[in-house]
Amino acid sequence: MSLSKIIPSNKKEEQKSINAIFNSIDKSEGIIFNSGAGAGKTYALIESLKYIIRNYEKSLKQHNQQIICITYTNVATKEVKERLGNTDLVLVSTIHERMWGLIKDYQKELVEIHKEKLEDEISSLKQKLEKGQGYEKFQELEEDLKGNFKKIMIENRELFFQNYSAKAAEVKKSFKILLNDYPNMLKNVGNFKRIVNAIYKLDQYSKCYENISLNKQGYKSVEYNSIYNNDQLYKMRISHDTLLDYGLKIIKKYDLLKQIIIDKYPFIFIDEYQDTDEKVILIMSYLEQYAKKIDHKIFIGYFGDTAQNIYDDGVGSEITKIHSGLKQIDKVFNRRSTKEVIEVINKIRNDSIEQISIYDDCEGGSVKFYKGTSGNVKDLIERYIYEWKITTENQLHCLVLTNKIVAEYSGFKNIYEAFKETDKYKGSNYNQLNTELLSNDLSKLGEIPKLLFNIVRLQNNLVDKTTSVIDITPKESLFDEMSIEGLRNLIKLLKQYQGKTLGEYIESISTVYSQVNDENYKKIIDWTFGFENITFELFKNHLIEKLFNNILDDDVDRATATIQKILEVDIVEYGLWYKFIMDKQEEKVIYHTYHGTKGREFDNVIIIMENAFGRNHNYFNFFFENFLHPDVLEGEKKLNFEKIKNLLYVSCSRAIKNLRVLYIDDVTDFESEIKEMFGEVYPF
């Protein structure tokens, strides 16, 4: 088995689906290209791009036109660029980078949309202050007292944030004299903070709105930067989700912009369409509709697979409801896995796409399903480390259901445990932790995880001798007018940071920041942190504000203690977390969440499975119990079944050669269904 000898008749048959894409390209006919896991979707995408270059290069260059290819991740962007080769005709990027490229030059229109966003936010904040729960003490005040209270708090913003993480008694003491006329306001410090935070936001947004209206310098353009995963609307800065909102609004509203995009980019490809935000699909639909209206040509091609839709924010099978009239082209050949793996994933998928290997030498893989207990996990892994001759060059990839296990086995258990205790990620928000702390897609990291990632990346880049100076910050203009000596001094300043823990490292940054007067140095630090005038206390309070929003008096000590845990984690552990996010782990056994393997492929895969997943205690058992008769399911149960099926399909289809599954709960009630899928169930 080497998966190298392509059967000529299969190659010829596969080419028919590729030719169908070419035919639609020539006719400017929108398509959905569905291909199962390992089918060579990227190959088909590359071939389509090459076809356009071969046949339309002269015309594209004459009309100053280009091809857009939107990928789901930066890793995919890199892969497409490498496989496509050097060309200026194709713009390959993630959706956020491309969306910004399409709209960033229309600042007048963007500022108007930003102004509308501010209006909505201002209205929402006023509503909270006037009628919201938790704001009652402010609502009880007379209008003149409300105005005076706002004035006092705005003038004492620094004092407020200095005491943000302090105990209730200390907060009351700090504001006792200032708020002498407001005896009821400090009775509940949690509500006091909630009210004041709303006042500060309202003040910032109102000033920004006014400055836009007055056409003041600094308020004439909107900025998007991929490093931040949070909006700072009052600074005219937007993040990922808001960028897509603005993109949809501006393209929907302005026909001239639609025509400019259509005429400049007559070919648009979207990779992994099933995981793409609905707003992007809407934009594409508007473009195609308008192209038909003005009788201009545009080709829009969606490449992906609805059976691999595993993210809640992806459009999935709803795509045809949003963008109608698309031609469907399916591909059934598998270019990744052995015959043994393909047979299993076909049974899991169980739809119109039944894959066969494109290769003649596709036999020789192995699939086994074990039943056991959690106590068997370590022994199973050890067995296959020996049997499969696992090394750092021939790694074993183990998929586990819980973030806790991934974090523990990957070396950053303390980071995970600390974040799990925050209000942001506990209770009903627990499932967010999977994506916002462990995602390899940086745009999906939570606001605070992304902030810590930026800091650890800076630390990593400073100690890594292979990192270029430019990689320390994307703001290349910082270095334009700097001498070599100035550059050396800047790097020397940055390398002064010391500290065994994250907290000590941040304190070190804060100390240097307060002592030096180097404008470029401060720009790099401000850019890394996302805010200015860095102090250790400000940083701690920022973490509390974001991870324990509107905490009550009784919770201040708990919040402070949890933030302290985050700060006391060894910087080396943060380095291991950084490697996990960047997919640069070097161990023999690599641990993943099920979701974290999307788009990947591995020779050797072990999947640990149980009934429960997250807060759902009847997850995979529900799927297996209904596997033979899914048609009887309706509504939420049907949607849940499809979601679980997709996740299992994605997970099992990562395997190239060897696949093992260990189910660590009792399978008696659905063992026959497992046998239908995997052939046999072996006791471990």
From Swiss-Prot:
Residues carrying the site annotation Interaction with GajA: 256, 259
Gene Ontology CC entries for this record: cytosol
Record domain UvrD-like helicase ATP-binding: where: 14-351
Molecular function via GO: 3'-5' DNA helicase activity; ATP binding; DNA binding; hydrolase activity
Record: residues binding ATP: 35-42
Top-level taxon of origin: Bacteria
Keywords, alphabetical: Antiviral defense, ATP-binding, Helicase, Host-virus interaction, Hydrolase, Nucleotide-binding
GO biological process: defense response to virus; recombinational repair
Keyword Hydrolase: yes
Keyword Signal belongs to the record: no
Domain notes: Contains a UvrD-like helicase domain.
Subunit composition and interactions: Homodimer. Interacts with GajA; 2 GajB dimers dock at opposite sides of the GajA complex to form a 4:4 GajA-GajB assembly (GajAB). GajAB interacts with Bacillus phage Phi3T Gad1 protein; this interaction forms a 4:4:8 GajAB-Gad1 complex and leads to GajAB inhibition.
The protein's role, per its UniProt record: Component of antiviral defense system Gabija type II, composed of GajA and GajB. Expression of Gabija type II in B.subtilis (strain BEST7003) confers resistance to phages phi105, and SpBeta. May be a helicase or contribute to GajA activation.
Family, as annotated: Belongs to the helicase family.
Family matches, as PANTHER family: DNA 3'-5' HELICASE, UVRD / RECB / PCRA DNA HELICASE FAMILY MEMBER
Protein name: Gabija protein GajB
Gene that encodes it: gajB
